[in-house]
Amino acid sequence: MHFLITNEVKKIFNDKLYSQRFKQITDLVSTKLNIDKKRFFECHFVDEKTIQEINKNYRNKDYITDVISFAFDDGEIITPLLGEMYICYQKVVDQASQFAHSFERELCFLFTHGLLHLLGYDHIKIEDEKIMFALQDEILNELKITRNINGARND
């Protein structure tokens, strides 16, 4: 499985670290969940205004959120394109501070969270939330992307 990054905020991703981390996450998820290597998805990094518009137009929720995913699979037709996710740069910055961990950890958490949504995971029901969040933690911990602010990059 591979991905295409679109950066509409021009504040991040000049550093190869994030692309490497995203590839590590994507490769690990592909292996764990046996995802066809030909599948791909798009990840867009956007500002607060853009994500609020997307949230309002497609989810009828008029507020800024951190990540939104649109899975293209409907269960019957499987296309190479899994879907698209949108991550709000400013929410990454704000939430890293709020939760007292690094920018890298928050960014990778939201990337993983959005990817799992593209693969059909959700957290509407408590039992589904436990499964999804346990898988997120397993992936991030295996890659040593932890909540320890001292050991991680904090941009």
UniProtKB/Swiss-Prot annotation:
Binding of Zn(2+), residues: 113, 117, 123
Key word Transmembrane helix present: no
Free-text remark on how the cofactor is bound: Binds 1 zinc ion.
Requisite cofactors: Zn(2+)
Protein's GO biological process: rRNA processing
Main enzyme class: hydrolase
Predominant place of localization: cytoplasm
Gene Ontology CC annotations of this record: cytoplasm
UniProt entry keywords in alphabetical sequence: Cytoplasm, Endonuclease, Hydrolase, Metal-binding, Nuclease, Ribosome biogenesis, rRNA processing, Zinc
GO molecular function terms listed in the Swiss-Prot or TrEMBL record: metalloendopeptidase activity; RNA endonuclease activity; zinc ion binding
Gene3D superfamilies per record: Metalloproteases ('zincins'), catalytic domain
Protein localization: Cytoplasm
NCBIfam families per UniProt: rRNA maturation RNase YbeY
Protein family membership: Belongs to the endoribonuclease YbeY family.
PANTHER family: ENDORIBONUCLEASE YBEY, CHLOROPLASTIC
HAMAP family referenced in this protein's UniProt entry, alphabetically: Endoribonucl_YbeY
UniProt function note: Single strand-specific metallo-endoribonuclease involved in late-stage 70S ribosome quality control and in maturation of the 3' terminus of the 16S rRNA.
Protein name per its UniProtKB record: Endoribonuclease YbeY
Organism from which the protein derives: Ureaplasma parvum serovar 3 (strain ATCC 700970)
